[in-house]
């Protein structure tokens, strides 16, 4: 009898464990659906830890499921990204710096990961209007979006594979700056759909204007620096050239000409250098003195015949001294 009770206890334990396992599988299946992995949706950004303060969505990015009809057939203004689900309200944060963005130039397809493959009607992709207010901080509204999807992928009731790419049949709509793509996965055999928001940077507009401005400013600064360097180089070259001219004038003219040339040269050099003496430029007083000294030295130097005569005279004088001593 004890043995029988023991078997009954074991059987009951196994039954409870089996029910718990089946319940877990059922709930996992019900909760598991899908999300956009590239370009990374807000939900996926939260799952990956690339976005912060996400709340519950970081644990179940696949679960943004709500009744069909968004963004236009039913009202959901300000709550489109969360699909009106209060537990995922963090997805409705809005603003150019509220979410990490993906460069639109690198987007040639949209990639989904499905944790449950439902029969599907289609996938549709909407984008914010070209003139939408990208600086707004209130949640995304239907009026922010183009009324027609720029991409529709029909499934005709078929279930997608575990992962699926939707290639762009043509280029992304022409945009500038920060924009949001609203992706809708419509399930065929239920009343629900899944919703994902993707943040893109098209460049050359709102989100990158400060960066462009900074780059432009940096370029301008670099250009100014280059111009300044070129001006300095030009000034230095000019100063050296003018100093050389002054020296030549000193060698071939009078002391007065040399001095005036030096004054003129150094006057220009001083003006070009903003009144400061450059390391490669001699002060005018030194140039004048140098020219005068060279001039005097050249005037006093005897020619070759004089030097030869002096040599002969010294040799003759030395010979006479030797003769007298002998």
From Swiss-Prot:
Glycosylation sites: 206, 215, 266, 303
Superkingdom of the organism of origin: Eukaryota
Role description: Lytic polysaccharide monooxygenase (LPMO) that oxidatively cleaves alpha- and beta-chitin with C1 regioselectivity. Catalysis by LPMOs requires the reduction of the active-site copper from Cu(II) to Cu(I) by a reducing agent and H(2)O(2) or O(2) as a cosubstrate. Exhibits enzymatic activity on U.maydis fungal cell wall chitin and Boosts chitin hydrolysis by chitinase GH18A.
Main location: secreted
Annotated organism of origin: Mycosarcoma maydis (Corn smut fungus)
Compartmental location: Secreted
Name of the molecule in the record: AA10 family lytic polysaccharide monooxygenase C
Family to which the UniProt record says this protein belongs: Belongs to the polysaccharide monooxygenase AA10 family.
Cofactor note: Binds 1 copper ion per subunit.
Domain Chitin-binding type-4: residue ranges: 33-200
Disulfide bonds: 81-197
InterPro entries to which the protein is assigned, alphabetical: Cellulose/chitin-bd_N, GlcNAc_Chitin_IntDeg, Ig_E-set
Keywords of this entry: Carbohydrate metabolism, Chitin degradation, Copper, Disulfide bond, Glycoprotein, Metal-binding, Monooxygenase, Oxidoreductase, Polysaccharide degradation, Secreted, Signal
EC identifiers of the protein: 1.14.99.-
Cofactor(s) in the UniProt record: Cu(2+)
Transmembrane segments: none
One GO term of the biological process aspect: chitin catabolic process
Pfam families: LPMO_10
Low complexity: compositionally biased ranges: 207-281
Annotated signal sequence range: 1-32
One GO CC annotation: extracellular region
GO molecular function: metal ion binding; monooxygenase activity
């Amino acid at each position: 009898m004890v043995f029988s009770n023991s078997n009954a206890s074991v059987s009951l334990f196994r039954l409870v464990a089996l029910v718990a396992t089946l319940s877990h599988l059922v709930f996992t299946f019900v909760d598991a659906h899908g999300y956009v992995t590239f370009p990374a949706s807000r939900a996926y950004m939260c799952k990956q830890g690339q976005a912060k303060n996400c709340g519950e969505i970081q644990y179940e990015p696949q679960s943004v499921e709500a009744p069909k009809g968004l963004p236009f057939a039913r009202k959901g203004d300000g709550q489109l990204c969360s699909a009106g689900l209060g537990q995922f309200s963090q997805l409705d944060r809005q603003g150019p710096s509220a979410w990490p963005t993906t460069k639109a130039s690198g987007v040639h397809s949209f990639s989904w990961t499905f944790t449950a493959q439902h029969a599907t009607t289609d996938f549709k992709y909407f984008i914010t209007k070209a003139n939408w207010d990208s600086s707004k901080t209130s949640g995304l509204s239907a009026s922010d979006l183009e009324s027609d999807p720029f991409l529709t992928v029909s499934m005709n009731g078929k279930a997608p594979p575990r992962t699926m790419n939707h290639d762009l049949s043509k280029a992304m709509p022409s945009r500038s700056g920060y924009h949001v793509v609203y992706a809708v996965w419509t399930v065929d055999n239920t009343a629900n759909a899944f919703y994902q928001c993707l943040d893109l940077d098209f460049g050359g507009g709102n989100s990158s204007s400060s960066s462009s401005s900074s780059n432009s400013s940096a370029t301008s600064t670099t250009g100014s620096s280059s111009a300044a360097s070129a001006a300095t180089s030009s000034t230095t070259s000019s100063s050296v050239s003018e100093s050389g001219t002054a020296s030549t004038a000193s060698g071939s003219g009078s002391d007065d000409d040399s001095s005036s040339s030096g004054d003129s040269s150094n006057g220009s050099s001083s003006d070009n250098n903003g009144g400061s003496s450059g390391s490669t430029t001699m002060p005018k007083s030194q140039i004048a003195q140098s020219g005068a000294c060279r001039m005097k030295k050249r005037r006093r130097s005897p020619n070759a015949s004089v030097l030869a005569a002096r040599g002969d005279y010294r040799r003759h004088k030395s010979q006479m001294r030797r003769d007298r001593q002998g």
